[in-house]
């Protein structure tokens, strides 16, 4: 928290503090307003309209940020959700499918969150353009999935990409290659907000530019921005006019987030006749998911609670797998008409996530964000569906990439499914060390992807390379100490083995 805010909180504990605080906050808001007006004067006529919308949106978020004090949830009010508010997927699936699947599919729009860069995996440009399977990128697989649906059922399900200013240009260049696919592709941009100095709480940006020295002055404000940006883009009204009724929103790097016909049918033909405006797919927590947001009952409504909102004294309780058994997959099904209604009433309420960052020059900043799932409490008749783990297959690291590139999964029409040859439906735990962090380095260290059908756990640390046709089974731990190197020879079978020390294989 900034020194400014700390000074404020001290002042609050004194007499007349609230009045003093109010004056300070008003002064600060006025200063920010002036700074934003200065920034807007640097916009060209072409940039002016969308920059003004962005800065107006930022001002609203900033105003709320200044008003908030302490954790945004009262721990005493958090309850487990009622039984009927989170339905098991098996129950949804048991209802079967309608005779005319195309009639429900034609009411759907698929939206993929495509604002992220591949920097965490050492790649420049949009993450969605990283090759994940047989040289297919995340975007290729998404297009293949939807094209398969449209061809199979003679439907017209469009794909919409929510880009950020970081990914828009590169994504649009690549979209030409899908011109002959049977998928209409649309894009819109999420907002661009200025980062603020952690001490002064004023914007770092001096002009609208986000290149050169100003590259780090701006950020995309989280996927909660989808509601306003989708509405402002005009696409929301376009789809409503075309008779579309629901959007299926998911992260483009979640390879398990395919269109599920059973969930869609449940939305379009609810058993009690009352339609859900918002469905969140949740899945059971494992020890690896303790930080994931969870669905709770709060003041009579379903509410997503993230770890950042939890008071420090209750963090361990929040992480407990026994008390909070599920977490949010960020696969969401949302009524288009409801988004329009709530957006026009300014009634979409999402908690602010304060994300601290340090810029390359060492300046400490904060960026204010919101999360798309946090809006669940603003919608009527919301529902959680507890889906199989297979619908949550995110690729955040090269460890995840190794899993999806391996023979653990088979690829069919853009969809990955667990191989029938694997005896257990669980996914192995894979931890690759820092030598594998960048995709380029990772690919160089595997002559071919090992056979992992019988693998339970793999840990690799240090300078390690794998030859062709290696097979890994059970628990395998490979550790090359600093200065050492281990080459796993071609055709090696490692089952329940620890490999350490130094092993070099050189061409004769």
Swiss-Prot record:
Location of the protein in the cell: Cytoplasm
Modified residues (N6-acetyllysine): 438
Region (Critical for end-to-end subunit interaction): 502-503
Entry-linked InterPro entries: Nucleotide-diphossugar_trans (IPR029044), UDPGP_fam (IPR002618), UDPGP_trans (IPR016267)
Main localization (coarse): cytoplasm
Residue numbers carrying Phosphothreonine: 426
Residues bearing PTM Phosphoserine: 13, 434, 448, 461
Binding site for substrate: 115-116, 223, 251-253
Recorded GO CC terms: cytoplasm
Binding site for UTP: 113-116, 127, 190, 222, 253, 396
Region Oligomerization: start-end pairs: 457-508
Active-site residues, Swiss-Prot/TrEMBL: 396
Pathway(s) this gene product operates in, as recorded in its UniProt entry: Glycan biosynthesis; glycogen biosynthesis
Gene Ontology molecular function, alphabetical: identical protein binding; metal ion binding; UTP:glucose-1-phosphate uridylyltransferase activity
Pfam family, one: UDPGP
Keywords: Acetylation, Cytoplasm, Magnesium, Metal-binding, Nucleotidyltransferase, Phosphoprotein, Transferase
Protein name: UTP--glucose-1-phosphate uridylyltransferase
Species per Swiss-Prot/TrEMBL record: Cricetulus griseus
Gene: UGP2
């Amino acid at each position: 928290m900034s020194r400014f805010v700390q000074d404020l909180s001290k002042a609050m504990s004194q007499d007349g503090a609230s009045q003093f605080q109010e004056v300070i906050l008003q002064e600060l808001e006025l200063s920010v307003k002036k700074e934003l007006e200065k920034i807007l004067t640097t916009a060209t006529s072409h940039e002016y309209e969308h920059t003004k919308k962005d800065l107006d949106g930022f001002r609203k978020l900033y105003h709320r940020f200044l008003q908030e004090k302490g954790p945004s949830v009262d721990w005493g009010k958090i309850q487990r959700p009622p039984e009927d508010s989170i339905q098991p997927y098996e129950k949804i699936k048991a209802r079967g499918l309608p005779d005319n699947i195309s009639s429900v599919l034609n009411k759907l729009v698929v939206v993929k969150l495509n604002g992220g860069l591949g920097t965490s995996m050492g790649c420049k440009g949009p993450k969605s353009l990283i090759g994940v399977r047989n040289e297919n990128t995340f975007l290729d697989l998404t297009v293949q999935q939807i094209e398969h649906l449209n061809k199979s059922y003679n439907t017209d399900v469009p794909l919409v990409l929510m880009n950020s200013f970081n990914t828009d240009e590169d994504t649009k260049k690549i979209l030409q290659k899908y011109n002959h696919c049977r998928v209409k592709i649309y894009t819109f941009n999420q907002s661009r907000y200025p980062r603020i100095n952690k001490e002064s709480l004023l914007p770092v940006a001096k002009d609208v530019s986000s290149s050169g020295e100003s590259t780090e002055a701006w950020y995309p404000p989280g996927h909660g921005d989808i509601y306003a940006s989708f509405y402002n883009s005009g696409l929301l009204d376009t789809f409503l006019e075309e008779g579309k009724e629901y959007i299926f929103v998911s992260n483009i790097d979640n390879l398990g987030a395919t269109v599920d016909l059973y969930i869609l049918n449940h939305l379009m033909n609810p058993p009690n006749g009352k339609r859900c405006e918002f469905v969140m797919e949740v899945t059971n927590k494992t020890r690896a998911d303790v930080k994931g947001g969870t669905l709770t009952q709060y003041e009579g409504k379903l509410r997503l609670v993230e770890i950042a909102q939890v008071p420090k004294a209750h963090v361990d309780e929040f992480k407990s797998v026994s008390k909070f058994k599920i977490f949010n997959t960020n696969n969401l099904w949302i009524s288009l008409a409801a988004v329009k209604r709530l957006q026009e009433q300014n009634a979409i309420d999402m908690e602010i996530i304060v994300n601290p960052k340090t810029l390359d020059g060492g300046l400490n900043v904060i960026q204010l964000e919101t999360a798309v799932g946090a809006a669940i409490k603003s919608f009527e008749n919301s529902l959680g569906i507890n889906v199989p783990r297979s619908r949550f297959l995110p690729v955040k690291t090269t460890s995840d990439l190794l899993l999806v590139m391996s023979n653990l999964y088979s690829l069919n029409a853009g969809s990955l499914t667990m191989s029938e040859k694997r005896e257990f439906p669980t996914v192995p735990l894979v931890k690759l060390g820092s030598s594998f962090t960048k995709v380029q380095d990772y690919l160089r260290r595997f002559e071919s992807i090992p056979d992992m059908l019988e693998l339970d756990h793999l840990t690799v640390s240090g300078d390690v390379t794998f030859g062709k046709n290696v097979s890994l089974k059970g628990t395998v731990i490979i550790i090359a100490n600093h200065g050492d190197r281990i080459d796993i020879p071609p055709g090696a079978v490692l089952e329940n083995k620890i490999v350490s020390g130094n092993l070099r294989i050189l061409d004769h």
